[in-house]
Amino acid sequence: MNFYSAYQHGFVRVAACTHHTTIGDPAANAASVLDMARACHDDGAALAVFPELTLSGYSIEDVLLQDSLLDAVEDALLDLVTESADLLPVLVVGAPLRHRHRIYNTAVVIHRGAVLGVVPKSYLPTYREFYERRQMAPGDGERGTIRIGGADVAFGTDLLFAASDLPGFVLHVEICEDMFVPMPPSAEAALAGATVLANLSGSPITIGRAEDRRLLARSASARCLAAYVYAAAGEGESTTDLAWDGQTMIWENGALLAESERFPKGVRRSVADVDTELLRSERLRMGTFDDNRRHHRELTESFRRIDFALDPPAGDIGLLREVERFPFVPADPQRLQQDCYEAYNIQVSGLEQRLRALDYPKVVIGVSGGLDSTHALIVATHAMDREGRPRSDILAFALPGFATGEHTKNNAIKLARALGVTFSEIDIGDTARLMLHTIGHPYSVGEKVYDVTFENVQAGLRTDYLFRIANQRGGIVLGTGDLSELALGWSTYGVGDQMSHYNVNAGVPKTLIQHLIRWVISAGEFGEKVGEVLQSVLDTEITPELIPTGEEELQSSEAKVGPFALQDFSLFQVLRYGFRPSKIAFLAWHAWNDAERGNWPPGFPKSERPSYSLAEIRHWLQIFVQRFYSFSQFKRSALPNGPKVSHGGALSPRGDWRAPSDMSARIWLDQIDREVPKG
């Protein structure tokens, strides 16, 4: 296995092409197709999709009934088949072909010097500017063979073209109007196993039609859990009564991977790498997809499968798709604003319902001046405001221990006072010393032993105090630990920060919490004074503050469990898709190896934009795998209630992640050893 090969990780490079049409000149059009096919070959593309009636042109109307044109189409088609024998891509080319007593609007599927099959257009429009049935026959229900170049090849709308050496690549083809009907052929094909859906389109442009196409293609890719490759006719088509924009686009499960400039001068291609393993994973998890297949089994089981050997390149061809560094945090500013609005209000509404159900208890929260407790506090404040409850019913406690820094403690105090909540400070130092002495810990006799017991005595006492205060004052303990910490087991179990009465942060990863706080600042919800404190919190190193300063420069969470940016990246791929470690490493390398490439979320400081080598990615992935699969599940199995927030998933044992607490991570670690280079 070549780790750097996209094809080895289930990607398929596809191209949606629009060329310069020479109407009524099939030889010229075939030559244009061949030029673009060679360019796609050089790009390492496995598929090249061309517009409807590629070889004749779409806009030639009754000329389609002329024998000379049809003869020239067949000759040009055979030349194209022969000339493309040494090319990698599967070519999907439009052609009017004679069959029985009619002409059919077809897509001819060509690979390595052979015609794999011919797909007729199912639905021919005869409304508004369209009059296709005047010249051609509808292909819905057609199943059989057609004679091309002296050979019988498969003909019908029931064809799936499957790469025998790339199991995730199964192609189905439909033509233009087929996408616009309520039950398109591609939907049946997806249920039958197609992962890549191609559409050859004529589709003249009018105001608003491009957006209609985008909506339909996006919807098809999302509903079918598939890729949708769309290519429309452009320059060179007749403008006697119509115009053409040459729109090409590639969608994958509702996400736009590539789109070309419309109204191009000359040829254009949209090229992207489709993740067939992602599509397979989504279908595997969404059981109703296969339930739908069973319901339509008479249709789906009648599809014919045509196998071919793709023989894709084994080397590094790069990766032609955006891999988000922060899959929980979109880089698009508008989408990030929307996500932050939704995440924040999911948390707030979740807490509101719990408070209503308990007849409005006080909210008891430990505040440290760190990200998580800061965000939980502002969520609680907003919930109280919405419910018309006094902010003084929030009881915020600073619980300094042996290593609490003045900066973080001051941030906690300033924030609590600026918000107008009830604030108190309880120094746990004396109680912690007593406990350490009682259990005979070396620290109690002056030894500088800062082990896990030393840390957990402090973490446990903080939680113990909060629960007893909640008992005393009629409150509930609000948890602050986030999704990233739950994934890594970076919490103290039981009587510790793992436990609470309700946790608003349980579904929010660390990387998103930072942006939620930025969003709250920019929204100005709590005023300028609160915003200044929140910014100070954002500027502070993430630390548990459990080991005394001076022994280490600063106790860093990320030095122990890894950069949260990388670990959140791995968590998303594992939780949402169940990807292998080798694929996660491949994606992480493309996302993180160059800080100058790709997009960063808005507001992300330039001075804090890291890059990671493959060796670093591999090391922290090993840490993630060990902690996630083997070490930390017992903490998640006893997780308090809290709302799911992200589409990436949550870790509640009652929801997205149900796993045994006593499992080994060996198979994942072995796969890293075998398949991820050491850098």
Curated annotation (Swiss-Prot):
List, alphabetically, the GO terms of the cellular component aspect. Answer: cytoplasm; peptidoglycan-based cell wall; plasma membrane
Q: Which PROSITE patterns match?
A: CN_HYDROLASE (PS50263)
Q: Which organism is it from?
A: Mycobacterium tuberculosis (strain ATCC 25618 / H37Rv)
Q: Can you tell me which residues bind L-glutamine?
A: 127, 203, 209
Q: Where is this region: Ligase?
A: 337-679
Q: In which pathway does it act?
A: Cofactor biosynthesis; NAD(+) biosynthesis; NAD(+) from deamido-NAD(+) (L-Gln route): step 1/1
Record comment: activity regulation: The formation of the intermediates complex at the synthetase domain stimulates the glutaminase activity.
Purpose = Catalyzes the ATP-dependent amidation of deamido-NAD to form NAD. Uses L-glutamine as a nitrogen source. In vitro, can also use ammonia with comparable specific activity.
Outline the subunit composition: Homooctamer; composed of two stacked homotetramers that form a ring-like structure.
Positions binding deamido-NAD(+) in this chain are 354, 456, 471, 475, 485, 490-493, 501, 635, 661
Entry EC no(s): 6.3.5.1
Segments forming domain CN hydrolase: 12-276
Q: For this chain's UniProt record, which GO biological process terms are given?
A: NAD biosynthetic process
What InterPro entries does the record point to? C-N_Hydrolase, C-N_Hydrolase_sf, Gln-dep_NAD_synthase, NAD+_synth_C, NAD/GMP_synthase, NAD_synthase, Rossmann-like_a/b/a_fold
Tell me the active site: 52, 121, 176
Q: Which amino acid positions bind ATP, per UniProt?
A: 366-373, 480
Name the keywords, alphabetized.
ATP-binding, Ligase, NAD, Nucleotide-binding
Q: What is this protein called?
A: Glutamine-dependent NAD(+) synthetase
